[in-house]
């Protein structure tokens, strides 16, 4: 039997017919009409009938260059005007307010969880968005001669690592040696010098990395460097 036939009905065979959204209790009875060794019993279950929910997000941007304190709106909404709640997996990278505005706090990765609760008409729904906040560098200069490549990185994100990779060409299929890495400590400039005397042609790629997230890469604007 159903406690609320306006929501759903159930027949003698246990087939449920849904009428509209809401909540109803179904009671299942075993009357022991066959006079077996089993006692009569009943079981009651609660059935919730809900419309499918979806969470829409206006802002599609999920990667940001690090600038502490920058605020952005996620622009999320749910069907039926259901209230949304927000949480961040890493508030040290991105914090999120009750109104859905994120604030950049540091460099790294954070997952923002958006939840629409069950309001009696629409089902509960959860959506997760992964954000990346990239380390930055204000400028990069490349100088070279027949023997050395000198890379100067200005204002890299503190405590990041400056990385210089030297490839055979702009196709970036073959890497010459290991990456050249220097940790950013104090000061606003990092200089890395690479011995390129053995290479007749090469292609440098420069970027910074922190907490597993890489900055945008800088390359030689004129393509391969040839001697």
Predicted regions and their residues:
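Extracytoplasmic soluble-region selector
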Residues: 1-135, 170-172, 178-184, 189
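Pro/Thr/Ser/Gly-rich low-complexity, intrinsically disordered linker/stalk tracts
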Residues: 135-155, 220-227
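Solvent-exposed loop/turn segments flanking beta-strands in beta-repeat/beta-sandwich domains
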Residues: 155-169, 176-177
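Alpha-helical transmembrane segments and their helix-helix packing motifs
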Residues: 216-217
């Amino acid at each position: 039997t159903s406690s609320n036939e306006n929501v759903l009905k159930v027949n003698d065979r246990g087939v449920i017919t849904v009428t509209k959204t809401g909540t109803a209790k179904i009671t299942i009875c075993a009357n022991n009409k066959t006079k077996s060794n089993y006692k009569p019993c009943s079981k009651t279950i609660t059935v919730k009938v809900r419309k499918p929910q979806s969470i829409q997000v206006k802002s599609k941007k999920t990667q940001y260059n690090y600038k502490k304190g920058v605020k952005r709106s996620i622009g999320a909404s749910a069907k039926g005007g259901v209230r949304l709640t927000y949480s961040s997996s890493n508030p040290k990278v991105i914090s999120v307010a009750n109104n859905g505005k994120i604030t950049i706090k540091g460099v790294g990765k954070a997952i923002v969880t958006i939840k629409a609760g069950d309001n009696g008409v629409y089902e509960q729904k959860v959506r997760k968005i992964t954000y990346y906040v990239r380390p930055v560098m204000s400028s990069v200069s490349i100088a070279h001669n027949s023997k050395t490549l000198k890379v100067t990185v200005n204002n890299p994100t503190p405590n990041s690592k400056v990385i210089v990779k030297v490839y055979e060409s702009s196709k970036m299929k073959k890497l010459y040696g290991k990456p050249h890495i220097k940790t950013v400590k104090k000061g606003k400039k990092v200089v890395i010098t690479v011995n390129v005397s053995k290479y007749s042609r090469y292609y440098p790629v420069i970027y910074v990395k922190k907490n597993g997230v890489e900055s945008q890469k800088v390359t030689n604007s004129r393509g391969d460097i040839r001697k």
